[in-house]
Amino acid sequence: MIAIFKREIRNYLKRPLFWVGVLLVIYGVFNATSPYLTTHYLTTGEKIINDQSNTSVEGEVYEGYIPATPEKHREVWHEKVKIKLTDVFGLTDSEAQNVIEKLESMNLKEAYAYLEQEYDWYGARYLYEDSTYYKGTAEEINAYLDKKLEDKTFSFYYARKFADFAGLYMVFFAIIMLAVLFLQDTKKHTYELLHTKPVTAGKYVMGKVSAGFTICLLVLTILNILFWVLCRIYTKDSGFEVRLWDFVASTVLYILPNMLMIVSIYTLISLIFKNPLPGVPLLILYMVYSNLGGTNAEGVYGYWGKPLAIMVRFPGQLFDTTPPPMACLL
């Protein structure tokens, strides 16, 4: 088995396709996560300038957005409702203010019903959702960062985004590279192997599986070290705490099990069909299944995770990510 393991590792490392794949994974992950590395404390009076609206249904701190508290959320919504009443429904400023004063004494459901009944306006609830995040002042953004980083490191949050996109790109990488590896089992390769070392079928399969998993582990090691260094470089002026362990923990919890599953599936398919190529479309479909959104018990659509998925995604904002339900089943 050792001879098979060493041969497969050499076959990987000597192929230019392998290193091209590694570079593409690095580029993809960096391109997707580098904006989060621009997060920083703001100086007094500093503003994050962009052409985005002052409120949004979702937004990142590096864009200047912070989540609104229930009180702030309601305050921002009232301001937008007042503007809508004057600009669209033709109310005067004093009339719109009277409506706002009535809404302040109602809960959200009552406020929605009032606006629907009095003004035939059914979009007020969507205006409320669009006020979930707002552009904060420098003091508000800094206070939000202090709160989020009080008990956890910056790398704890960033490592989850790293695991999100590294897991996605590593699935593509593993699907292609493992197909190439298993395709090497031509008659010529097998003939040479069987006439140089005594080998059983079990040892041969274990050698292939362990080599495939080890090569994925090697790539993930490179990614962990590289992005840990990048995270330290980008955030050195912000004073954020960055730990290598956060990257390792996210990789072990959310990526390594998926790599082992992909290698095992490829091995099983290769044994059944005597060819690894049928595994490519099957694994791509498996990846699509793992990445599909869904509706929870409350009817809210989003990414909730699926049993035996080969990817764990963290689609929320940087400081609001949580492992999806059923991630423990992966």
Spans of features found by a protein language model:
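Hydrophobic alpha-helical transmembrane segments
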Residues: F5, F18-V22, V248-L253, V280-L282, ...
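Secretory targeting signals
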Residues: L24-K72, A113, Y122-I176, M206-P276
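Membrane-anchoring hydrophobic segments
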Residues: F154-R160, D185, E192-L194, Y301
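Extracytoplasmic loops/domains of multi-pass membrane proteins
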Residues: K72-S131
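Terminal transmembrane helical anchor/hairpin motif
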Residues: P35-K80, D146-F154, L277-L330
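Transmembrane alpha-helix boundary/hinge residues in polytopic small-molecule transporters
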Residues: H189-T190, S264, V280
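Helix-loop-helix units of permease transmembrane domains in multi-pass membrane transporters
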Residues: A3-I4, A179-L218
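Aromatic- and glycine-rich beta-strand/loop motifs that create alpha-glucan
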Residues: M1-V25
